[in-house]
Swiss-Prot record:
NCBIfam families: PRK00010.1
Family as reported in the entry's similarity comment: Belongs to the universal ribosomal protein uL5 family.
Domain of life where this protein originates: Bacteria
Organism in which the protein naturally occurs: Malacoplasma penetrans (strain HF-2)
Free-text function comment from the UniProt entry: This is one of the proteins that bind and probably mediate the attachment of the 5S RNA into the large ribosomal subunit, where it forms part of the central protuberance. In the 70S ribosome it contacts protein S13 of the 30S subunit (bridge B1b), connecting the 2 subunits; this bridge is implicated in subunit movement. Contacts the P site tRNA; the 5S rRNA and some of its associated proteins might help stabilize positioning of ribosome-bound tRNAs.
UniProt keywords, alphabetically: Ribonucleoprotein, Ribosomal protein, RNA-binding, rRNA-binding, tRNA-binding
Gene name of this polypeptide: rplE
Protein name listed in UniProt: Large ribosomal subunit protein uL5
Subunit details: Part of the 50S ribosomal subunit; part of the 5S rRNA/L5/L18/L25 subcomplex. Contacts the 5S rRNA and the P site tRNA. Forms a bridge to the 30S subunit in the 70S ribosome.
């Protein structure tokens, strides 16, 4: 039996009700939900040292608890010393329990550890209800031991929702506890 996330319980009990009230959905099937979270890390130094890809894969595995895949270049570019098919990044797609557990850890532990954090930008929605933001350092996650890190690397996190508009997706993520930048309202 899988362990249910606290955030998933909050979504089922509280967030669905507030979404129904806010957007006047006729059916519970219209309520936006999280579909997946994709974490992508570009390892630019991997062209010179192949061990960097292994380190990047290991770090993503520690952070997410799921085995990532190596992303490969599509074509050769001589100026970047890049060959076709060479591993240049790492990617992992989280769904179901792994997704909810990662989001809980991201919101409650990792994001508060970001230096000089003032909130996530509200302008990073793609127009289809998906939200993407970047993390500059992997050390904000508790699984990464600072002394073992040779180089600080960042990665992109994309939260894919079933929301039709950015407004619905933003309301969903706000209700789940995502710390967005406070906008200045007219007095």
């Amino acid at each position: 039996m899988a362990i249910k996330s606290v955030l998933y319980d909050k979504y089922k009990k509280d967030v669905t009700k507030s979404l129904m009230k806010e957007f006047n959905y006729k059916s519970t099937m219209e309520i936006p939900r999280l579909e997946k979270i994709v974490i992508n890390s570009g390892l630019g130094d991997a062209t010179s040292d192949s061990k960097i890809v292994e380190i990047g894969l290991k770090e993503l595995h520690l952070i997410t608890g799921q085995k990532p895949i190596a992303t490969k270049s599509k074509k050769s570019i001589a100026t970047f010393k890049l060959r076709e098919g060479q591993a240049i990044g790492a990617k992992v797609t989280l769904r179901r329990e792994n997704m909810w557990n990662f989001l809980t850890k991201l919101i409650s532990i990792a994001i508060p550890r970001i230096r000089d954090f003032r909130g996530l930008s509200t302008k990073s929605f793609d127009g289809n209800g998906n939200y993407t933001f970047g993390i500059k350092e992997q050390i904000i996650f508790p699984e990464i031991v600072y002394d073992d890190v040779k180089k600080l690397r960042g990665f992109d996190i994309t939260i894919v929702t079933s929301a039709k508009t950015d407004k619905e997706a933003m309301f969903l993520l706000k209700e789940l506890g995502m710390p967005f930048v406070k906008t200045k309202e007219a007095k």
